[in-house]
């Protein structure tokens, strides 16, 4: 295994250098405590740093110093972005996102804080997090909210992972004033998300995968020009972040003596169960990255390393399934790609890429599960990437760990930046936690694969981490048994913690390295031909037909009789042991279209649940960015019944399309009236008042769409999809 995975195996004696696929990096220790790092494209001098490791590998020690240097380089007193304040500096004693990204983004700074910044630079990290809190512009809407940055279809609620902010904030609650800000933001943000993106039928929160936010890179190609599906879908990573936020809300509510603590706990318990059940795909022994919408909640054959790692760390998965999912996550030459399988037609970015911050989360998850092979491979992948690039880059091509591979239209990574903040934090985390086992709470629980002993210890009996006046010493084990080295006896000698490592048995099953890395191409949408009192849907060879959330046994065609309900169908192709992403969906059944822009009168012809959407245009911004997704409240008023209310979303569109679907329950024969009320989108936050990259910034709140009709029809059951 070591020969396949290891830095140690590639150069067990010359621990000052690393060679990978014909490229070499080398480090030299200097007398002043600094280092010189040389890599294929250059050389840099790294000065002495506040923290220092003493191992058998000058390269390991130098890369830790480089991460500290790059964290210092990411410290700024002002930030800027062309889309805000006309690109002029905005005062903020915080961190910029990277050399090419001199601004603060909610997702980036939050993951970076959770990995390392909160423990190393707490006050500056609080400043960065505070920058992403905002009241509403109108001065009347109560509460403080976490800002969802510009994004797919006009931002929130298409993207709904802003709750990652609370993952970072939970490590900074020792400051009472900040803790109160966190509590205030939790209440408002969670209430808003519960109203706008929680689906009570499915039990999950809707919205885009966290971090994987470039539509066709990881979602089907057909989402490139229509992000409604993304807004309606359910993502593993985003739901785990909502779960963690709910647990924090429960904790803070109890501290405040707030009766809502029990409600937050109930919500979290139910969400944990829904995550564990709905995302688990038994045939692949894996948790999928996302599901289809509530009308068709199929599991898409895509897994993502961040989602799996966050789920492991949050303990939302049953232990054995967690082990199986992480152990079974595929490996390629450069490490663990952030998604699996890959798309042969997409350029390199999230597709076909290793992202260091995600590798750091996988390392953290592997430690939690005592997965020695995964701990080793993630540490080594992180070392290779930063050493061969001479910086903690944003991302790398997954096989070569190159910062750019030329392949015509599929070249990439399409975007890349040196000293990317979350990559820097990921590397720091890998050393502090991954090697020395030092937790943010001061605990020392090393879990070091024995395969790394030659690299780190060489002929030494100890390796050392100096952190200010504190010293952490790991003593080499005397016995050779056990694949995972953990803490035995621990001695405290003044400011020095001495840990005697002992061997523990661990599963040494290496991750799979599949030869086939590309998914089959996505099929076209199913085609239905009218036949008698129903439809015949032909099933092309090599594809599986899904209906209302589950696969059908039919192999050549399906004859679907009219039953008075809406049915949703899609196709997926299977080849070489892999399944494609799903085709665009086909909806069959009695769908009534009622013209109108704000109010509609309608009489239900049958009782039960109905699905409703709006036909609209939203030309307020491009499909890939902005803050002006139209968010409205659709009310249903039926004679003798309580008013029902749901949030409907109309993302930026390319021409005319349908909004997100919502569900209402009606009684047959009742006359009902639908009407729209205004909602809340990100342009309503004061945070975006200086946004000049599109509408909804300096021109004021923009929450509009051109609605032409309402579509309504009886819903089919999706229970078989659970």
Task: Show the residue positions of the predicted features.
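Extended, well-ordered alpha-helical scaffold segments
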Residues: 59-67, 121-134, 177-196, 241, ...
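Acidic/polar, glycine-enriched structural segments that form the non-catalytic walls/loops
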Residues: 6-102, 176-179, 187-195, 251-260, ...
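Extended glycan-interaction surfaces of carbohydrate-active proteins
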Residues: 20, 54-103, 127-155, 198-233, ...
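Non-catalytic C-terminal accessory modules of carbohydrate-active enzymes
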Residues: 365-368, 373-534
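Aromatic-rich carbohydrate-recognition surfaces in CAZymes
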Residues: 102-209, 235-243, 353-380, 406-437
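Extracytoplasmic
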Residues: 557-565, 571-722
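Short proline/glycine-enriched turn/loop motifs at strand-loop junctions of beta-rich domains
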Residues: 532, 538-544, 607, 618-620
């Amino acid at each position: 295994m070591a020969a396949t995975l290891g830095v140690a195996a590639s150069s067990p004696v010359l621990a000052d250098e690393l060679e990978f696929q014909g490229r070499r990096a080398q480090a030299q220790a200097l007398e002043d405590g600094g280092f010189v790092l040389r890599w294929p494209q250059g050389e840099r001098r790294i000065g002495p740093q506040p923290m220092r490791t003493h191992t058998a590998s000058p390269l390991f020690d130098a890369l830790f110093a480089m991460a500290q240097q790059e964290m210092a380089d990411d410290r700024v007193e002002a930030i800027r972005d062309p889309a805000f304040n006309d690109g002029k500096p905005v005062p903020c004693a915080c961190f910029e996102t990277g050399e090419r990204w001199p601004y603060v983004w909610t997702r980036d700074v939050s993951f970076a804080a959770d990995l390392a910044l909160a423990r190393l630079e707490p006050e500056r990290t609080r400043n960065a997090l505070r920058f992403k809190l905002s009241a509403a512009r109108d001065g009347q809407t109560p509460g403080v909210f976490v800002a969802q940055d510009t994004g797919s279809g006009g931002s929130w609620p298409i993207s709904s992972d802003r709750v990652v902010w609370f993952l970072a904030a939970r490590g900074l609650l020792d400051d009472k004033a900040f803790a109160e800000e966190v509590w205030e933001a939790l209440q408002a943000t969670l209430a808003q998300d519960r109203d706008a993106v929680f689906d009570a039928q499915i039990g999950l929160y809707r919205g885009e995968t966290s971090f994987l936010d470039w539509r066709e890179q990881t979602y089907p190609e057909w989402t490139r020009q229509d992000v409604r599906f993304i807004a309606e879908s359910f993502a593993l990573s985003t739901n785990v972040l909502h779960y963690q936020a709910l647990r924090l809300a429960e904790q803070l509510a109890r501290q405040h003596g707030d009766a809502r603590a029990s409600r937050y706990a109930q919500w979290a318990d139910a969400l944990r169960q829904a995550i564990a059940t709905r995302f688990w795909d038994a045939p692949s022994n894996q948790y999928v990255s996302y599901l289809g919408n509530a009308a068709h909640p199929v599991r898409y054959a895509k897994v993502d390393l961040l989602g799996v790692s966050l789920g492991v760390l949050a303990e939302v998965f049953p232990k054995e399934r967690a082990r199986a999912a992480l152990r079974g996550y595929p490996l390629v030459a450069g490490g663990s790609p952030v998604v699996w399988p890959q798309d042969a037609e997409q350029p390199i970015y999230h597709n076909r890429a290793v992202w260091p911050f995600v590798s750091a989360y996988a390392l953290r998850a592997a430690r939690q599960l005592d997965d020695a092979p995964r701990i080793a491979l993630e540490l080594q992948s992180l070392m290779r990437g930063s050493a061969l690039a001479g910086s903690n880059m944003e991302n790398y091509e997954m096989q070569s760990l190159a910062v750019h591979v030329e392949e015509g239209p599929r070249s990439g990574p399409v975007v890349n930046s040196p000293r990317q903040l979350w990559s820097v934090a990921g590397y720091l985390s890998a050393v502090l936690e991954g090697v020395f086992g030092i937790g943010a709470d001061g605990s020392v629980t090393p879990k070091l694969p024995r395969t790394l002993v030659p690299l780190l210890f060489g002929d030494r009996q100890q390796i050392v981490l100096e952190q200010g006046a504190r010293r952490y010493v790991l003593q080499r084990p005397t016995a050779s048994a056990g694949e995972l080295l953990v803490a035995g006896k621990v001695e405290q000698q003044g400011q020095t913690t001495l840990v005697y490592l002992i061997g523990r048995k661990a599963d040494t099953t290496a991750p799979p390295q599949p030869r086939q890395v590309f998914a089959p191409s996505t099929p076209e949408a199913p085609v239905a031909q009218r036949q008698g009192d129903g439809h015949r849907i032909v099933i092309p060879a090599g594809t599986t037909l899904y209906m209302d959330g589950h696969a059908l046994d039919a192999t050549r065609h399906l004859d679907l009789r009219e039953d008075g309900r809406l049915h949703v169908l899609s196709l997926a192709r299977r080849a070489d042991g892999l399944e494609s992403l799903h085709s665009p969906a086909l909806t069959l059944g009695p769908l009534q279209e009622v013209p109108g822009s704000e109010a509609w009168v309608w009489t239900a012809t049958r009782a039960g649940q109905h699905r409703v959407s709006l036909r609209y245009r939203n030309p307020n911004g491009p499909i890939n960015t902005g803050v002006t997704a139209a968010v409205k409240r659709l009310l249903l008023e039926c004679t003798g019944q309580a008013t029902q209310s749901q949030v409907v979303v109309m993302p930026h569109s390319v021409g005319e399309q349908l909004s997100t679907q919502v569900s209402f329950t009606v009684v047959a024969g009742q006359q009902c009236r639908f009407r729209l009320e205004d909602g809340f989108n990100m342009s309503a936050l004061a945070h975006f008042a200086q946004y000049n990259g599109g509408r909804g910034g300096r021109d004021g709140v923009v929450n509009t769409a051109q609605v032409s009709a309402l579509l309504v029809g009886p819903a089919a059951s999706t229970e078989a999809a659970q």
